[in-house]
Amino acid sequence: MTRSVGAGGVALLGVMLFWAGVLGAGVLVSGYSAREDYISSLAGRGSQVALLGVGALLASAAAHLATSWAVLTAWRSRVCAPLIFAAAVASTVLAVFRQSCPDGPAGCARTDTPDDDWVDAVHRAGVGAYELFVLAAMLTLAVGALRGRAAWPRWLGVVSLVFAAGSLLLVSQTSGEQVGLWQRIWLANNLAWLLIVAGVATMRDPADGRPHRFS
């Protein structure tokens, strides 16, 4: 019981630390634009605030890991929980395999660097994998709830479906103009869903204090 509630707190703290790290690191870099530059540039190889950037990415990974545990503990989900766990692993990959920004984070997303290598390829694959795992987790909750056989509430299925559509639409905008802005809105969408799931999964039944089951 306590571990599940604690997981919800860790998820919230992880998301807060992620955004604090992103905002703090961005302010410290001259010329960095939240509208035009990727978040991962802050953690890039060549970034003067790489430590803060990496810390932010790891905080996001911790939030996903905690939510995975909350879902597994509350609902015994053998599909959704592993998918969120996989998203946590993908987030960790982004922190470990950092993109090359030899001239620093500012403008890194807008310039083609000759130092692009296999590490950058792994980083890009990690971004794609993260989105796929999160989308799959959202759709798993949606399908399970709408079929009426899930331990989580039906409304969470509808909410997850809306967030899945938003995630897919927003991530498609992260390779055009104002990539930094779109990436932030996309991640805000995904992390908001994550916190909703963590919150619902850690709700207590007032009768016995156990995880509340909605089925």
Regions found by a protein language model. Give the residues of each.
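Short, intrinsically disordered terminal tails adjacent to the first/last structured region
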Residues: 1, 206-215
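Hydrophobic, aromatic-enriched alpha-helical segments typical of multi-pass transmembrane helices
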Residues: 2-204
